[in-house]
């Protein structure tokens, strides 16, 4: 295994402490207005300050909407879990108002909107659904009608996300909830997603469900067997590898208890992977990045689809914390070279054509940690250049601690500095960020970037997805970039996680998809009147936008984009990460793959 490849990093904490100690005795030339702006920024990240989100004890914090919302969620889940397999415990009496009414939970007259050999999709027609079910018997009948569609299924699981709460005169309330139910059959899978509008009435200390109406409904059938679109081949391909069994399968929790944090391991699991044909045999191979203290792994594909782990043999088993890697041909010799984003910077390897790698150069990044890599020939000189997203500024040994400290939370500008590495040939790479114009608005928390010629002028433009705020759209004009995200309608102020380009509507123009985080709690809280009462309406709207979810930006062909996310139905990707346009069913239309989740442990409440 390779030794640790590291540079020292001096923490500025002692210097900052000294400056703070000296400040009271120094004459200040700081503009009071700037101090007030700083206070506002700090308020945005201090829980409970100036009407910020509620503490864990919502009742103590005076957030009656959250107290009620928790009760409403419990009531709705009690009924929804009757649909699970095995079904949940029957709800107690006294949860429904005597005058309770409900529409059918699986509306009649479903319209088929899509069919191919893999999927069938049906939707409820637009319009208000009749409240035809009454009382507890009516609700149980509505649940039973929905369950009939799942007759014979196994593994049924329901999920509710209560995303809107409105309290009325003290005795009435309204909620909106996203509902999803899925199950498996021998011949396929079945999934339902719907939006429920519910009204509530108070009876003493209790809240009773008064009515439920299905505002939207969609069901999708996935056909398996010979027509299965995907097959999980993880075990068939990787289980024969000792490295897979002993290192990857135990999971991060296992290694967190065995490797010191200062080696570069943390619970976030911020590691990526790279795919490429390293030896020219026509089969893709897999490079898996690992946290500090564990060697990166290179799985070379065999003729039968299994893999052989060869990282040490081929010279790429680095032990340094690695967030990203990329296979690209950097020297134009026809094989896939390797870039690896290690903790100190980017290490660049040459491929000998047979899959054996030799480190040729390293570009240290002393200001920030490299998180992701994207390559293109931005200056049209015939070789590939590299853009490095750097997310966090360096903080010494405690460089990450799972979450960043953005200021202000929803529009942070205190992140890492991204870097453009220009390929000057003969394995020489120079820092070209400033001279190329890419240092403008370059202190965000950048997770990912995607190159594309969105304006069809012959050069590659760059979109950067930033966590905690606005994104960047850098238009390329003959190798010089200008950030036009604001004027182009492409800032998408959100917790950006990834971005990808694709012509989703087949109009010849490349459109843009950005994965963010959908938060039901964020939607509820930011819509309340008491949320950040001292902030401007613009700031409040930005917080609401932050919780909305994913974004689809349609290229209008005039240098601008239109947000069509809600009309296209793509906002709810949960806590989304990587995303990719791909025509999965070969029908000529770009589909979307979106990964989601975060920390997976034995606790079922984990994301």
Predicted segment positions?
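Acidic, glycine/proline-rich Ca2+-coordinating loop motifs
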Residues: 26-607
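Intrinsically disordered, low-complexity proline-rich regions
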Residues: 8-12, 27
């Amino acid at each position: 295994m390779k030794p640790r490849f590291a540079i020292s990093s001096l923490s500025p904490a002692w210097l900052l402490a000294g400056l703070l100690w000296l400040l009271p005795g120094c004459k200040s030339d700081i503009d009071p207005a700037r101090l007030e702006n700083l206070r506002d920024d700090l308020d945005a990240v201090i829980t409970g300050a100036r009407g910020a989100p509620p503490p864990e004890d919502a009742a103590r914090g005076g957030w009656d909407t959250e107290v009620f919302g928790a009760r409403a969620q419990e009531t709705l889940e009690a009924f929804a879990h009757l649909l699970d397999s095995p079904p949940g415990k029957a709800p107690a009496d006294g949860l429904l108002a005597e005058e309770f009414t409900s529409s059918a939970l699986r509306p009649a007259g479903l319209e088929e909107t899509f069919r191919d050999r893999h999927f069938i999709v049906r939707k409820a027609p637009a319009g208000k659904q009749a409240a035809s079910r009454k009382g507890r018997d009516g609700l149980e009948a509505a649940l039973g009608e929905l369950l009939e569609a799942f007759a014979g299924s196994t593994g049924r699981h329901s999920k509710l996300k209560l995303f809107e709460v409105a309290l009325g005169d003290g005795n009435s309330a309204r909620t909106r909830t996203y509902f999803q139910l899925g199950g498996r059959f021998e011949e396929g899978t079945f999934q339902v997603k719907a939006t429920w509008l519910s009204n509530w009435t108070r009876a003493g200390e209790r809240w009773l469900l008064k009515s439920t109406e299905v505002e939207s409904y969609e069901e999708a059938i996935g056909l398996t067997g010979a027509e299965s679109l995907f097959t999980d081949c993880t075990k068939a391909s990787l289980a024969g590898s000792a490295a897979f069994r002993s290192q990857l399968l135990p999971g991060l929790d296992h290694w967190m208890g065995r490797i010191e944090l200062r080696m570069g391991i943390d619970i976030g699991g911020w590691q990526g992977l790279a795919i490429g044909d390293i030896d020219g045999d026509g089969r893709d191979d897999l490079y898996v990045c690992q946290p500090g203290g564990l060697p990166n792994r290179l799985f070379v594909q065999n003729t039968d689809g299994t893999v052989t782990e060869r990282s040490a043999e081929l010279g790429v088993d680095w032990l340094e914390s690695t967030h990203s890697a990329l296979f690209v041909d950097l020297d134009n010799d026809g094989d896939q070279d390797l870039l690896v984003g290690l903790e100190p910077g980017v290490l660049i390897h040459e491929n000998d054509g047979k899959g054996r790698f030799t480190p040729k150069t390293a570009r240290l990044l002393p200001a920030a940690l490299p998180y992701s890599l994207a390559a293109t020939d931005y200056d049209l000189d015939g070789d590939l250049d590299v853009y490095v997203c750097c997310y966090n500024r360096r903080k010494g040994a405690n460089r990450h601690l799972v979450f960043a400290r953005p200021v202000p939370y929803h529009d942070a500008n205190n992140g890492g500095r991204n870097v453009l590495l220009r390929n000057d040939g003969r394995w020489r790479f120079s820092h070209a960020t400033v001279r190329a114009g890419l240092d403008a608005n370059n202190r965000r928390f950048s997770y990912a970037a995607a190159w594309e010629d969105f304006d069809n002028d012959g050069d590659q433009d760059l979109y950067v997805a930033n966590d905690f705020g606005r994104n960047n759209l850098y238009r390329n004009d003959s190798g010089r970039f200008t950030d036009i995200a604001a004027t182009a309608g492409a800032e998408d102020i959100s917790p950006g996680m990834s971005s990808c380009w694709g012509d989703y509507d087949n109009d010849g123009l490349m459109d843009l998809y950005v994965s963010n985080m959908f938060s039901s709690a964020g939607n509820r809280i930011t819509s309340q009147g008491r949320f950040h009462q001292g902030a401007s309406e613009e700031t409040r709207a930005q917080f609401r936008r932050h919780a909305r979810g994913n974004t689809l930006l349609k290229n209008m062909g005039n240098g601008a984009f239109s947000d069509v996310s809600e009309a296209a139905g793509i906002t709810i990707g949960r806590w989304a990460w990587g995303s990719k346009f791909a025509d999965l069913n070969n029908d000529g239309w770009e589909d979307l793959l979106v990964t989601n989740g975060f920390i997976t442990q034995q606790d079922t409440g984990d994301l």
